[in-house]
Amino acid sequence: MEPDSVIEDKTIELMCSVPRSLWLGCANLVESMCALSCLQSMPSVRCLQISNGTSSVIVSRKRPSEGNYQKEKDLCIKYFDQWSESDQVEFVEHLISRMCHYQHGHINSYLKPMLQRDFITALPEQGLDHIAENILSYLDARSLCAAELVCKEWQRVISEGMLWKKLIERMVRTDPLWKGLSERRGWDQYLFKNRPTDGPPNSFYRSLYPKIIQDIETIESNWRCGRHNLQRIQCRSENSKGVYCLQYDDDKIISGLRDNSIKIWDKSSLECLKVLTGHTGSVLCLQYDERVIVTGSSDSTVRVWDVNTGEVLNTLIHHNEAVLHLRFSNGLMVTCSKDRSIAVWDMASATDITLRRVLVGHRAAVNVVDFDDKYIVSASGDRTIKVWSTSTCEFVRTLNGHKRGIACLQYRDRLVVSGSSDNTIRLWDIECGACLRVLEGHEELVRCIRFDNKRIVSGAYDGKIKVWDLQAALDPRAPASTLCLRTLVEHSGRVFRLQFDEFQIISSSHDDTILIWDFLNVPPSAQNETRSPSRTYTYISR
């Protein structure tokens, strides 16, 4: 590489051979060299000075007479218009390759705005408003806020397209928290209207969205901090105390009691609506849907009841000892018993239930079962979890790890969560049988457990309910000390069963009570409490 002094000498020599008017506009040596490079490669090109101090080099060819130029230009355009698009592109590429750097920059400045067209504004001009609305409807809330600030036309498309309403509707369709909140807060009445005139304007939904976000953040904070409104149903069994099982929906709570009865409660008033009798032993497990209630008892029978009338529709006599747990779904029912067996039933209707297969393999009472289309999962006092094929009822694998008998589990997708009399909770990958995490904190047998996408909630014989961070528990890097979010202590006896959703936990206990832990409707006074868990009591005795 030549030293700068040599380059400068050559440049000065070249500049001296060129009239001064050709390089006067070049403000420095580098620009001079660029201009002279153009001159050397294109002898017919002249470099002209730019005024106003921009120090830019303009290179242009010597223009022929005006008349010839216009004729030649028109002729060139005429031929250009007759060519195909590919030929036009090829011609322009050749043309650009013969130009200098300054000309390239000038063309780039001309093309840049043409390549940055505002298609959202252009589409409505072509009568394609619906396409512009559809494009913007995929934005999340933050992006939609930014889009409103682009220009008035974008704001108009968002407003007339009711895109804030559509965003809220999309969240309600895909997120159970949003769906439940829309029903409980009442703003579901403004959604999914067929005609835009049936509801409020876009501004209503624009202001509603941040209120929903604030509501959700408050609910999550209530879960983390243990703030809740507590309602208590005192069951007051006459013969013996204990609520062994329960299930609820928006309207009712159905519970199975140690006194052999099934009680149905109104969820709003907490009044006992109906008492079902027929079992001759404690009601240990139940499940219901929109048609039937199925119960299992220590009398070793399974009974099927009409959920509306309370009439007994069917009684299944198969197990030799207490029926400890059952699940049914999509025409299949699985029951398990103290007799160490699992029964798989085809459930065509409430009155047409036939035994398909008996699964044998556990060496102690089978305390709990769960299943989906792929696997049946069972847990036993023999310390093992066994996995069976749902379609063939064949044994698949055993999950080993608990040190004592297993009292409860839930299975969904690949995840199994189990609770044991060794006082621990274990998370398992059902496909490979690996134990993913051990949760410690309960002081006695873990009797009941449920999980969703965010949380695990467990109840134990120590009378405590613990809320765990599921996502953190699945992260091997998360410290054990961060996994338990909150411990709830209100029951005075063993916690037998619980169920929860995004807004509440409902639990039952040996203390003969059902507790409703409401994390949505927390009084403002409790919201301001930060040092300790807050609660408000509603006591119902029946």
From Swiss-Prot:
SMART domains: Beta-TrCP_D, FBOX, WD40
Keywords linked to the UniProt accession: Biological rhythms, Cell cycle, Cytoplasm, Nucleus, Repeat, Ubl conjugation pathway, WD repeat, Wnt signaling pathway
Region (Homodimerization domain D): 67-116
Induction: Expression is negatively regulated by Wnt/beta-catenin pathway.
PROSITE patterns associated with the record: FBOX (PS50181), WD_REPEATS_1 (PS00678), WD_REPEATS_2 (PS50082), WD_REPEATS_REGION (PS50294)
GO MF, one example: protein dimerization activity
Pathway: Protein modification; protein ubiquitination
Entry's localization field: Cytoplasm; Nucleus
Cellular component annotations (GO), alphabetically ordered: cytoplasm; cytosol; nucleus; SCF ubiquitin ligase complex
GO biological process: negative regulation of non-canonical NF-kappaB signal transduction; positive regulation of circadian rhythm; positive regulation of DNA-templated transcription; positive regulation of proteolysis; proteasome-mediated ubiquitin-dependent protein catabolic process; protein dephosphorylation; protein destabilization; protein polyubiquitination
Keyword tRNA-binding included in the entry's annotation: no
Annotated WD repeat ranges: 238-275, 278-315, 318-355, 361-398, 401-440, 442-478, 490-527
A Pfam family per the record: F-box-like
Domain F-box: 121-167
Oligomeric and partner information: Self-associates. Component of the SCF(FBXW11) complex formed of CUL1, SKP1, RBX1 and a FBXW11 dimer. Interacts with BST2 and USP47. Interacts with TRIM21. Interacts with PER3. Interacts with INAVA. Interacts with REST.
Primary role: Substrate recognition component of a SCF (SKP1-CUL1-F-box protein) E3 ubiquitin-protein ligase complex which mediates the ubiquitination and subsequent proteasomal degradation of target proteins. Probably recognizes and binds to phosphorylated target proteins: the interaction with substrates requires the phosphorylation of the two serine residues in the substrates' destruction motif D-S-G-X(2,3,4)-S. SCF(FBXW11) mediates the ubiquitination of phosphorylated CTNNB1 and participates in Wnt signaling regulation.
Name of the molecule in the record: F-box/WD repeat-containing protein 11
Species this chain originates from: Mus musculus (Mouse)
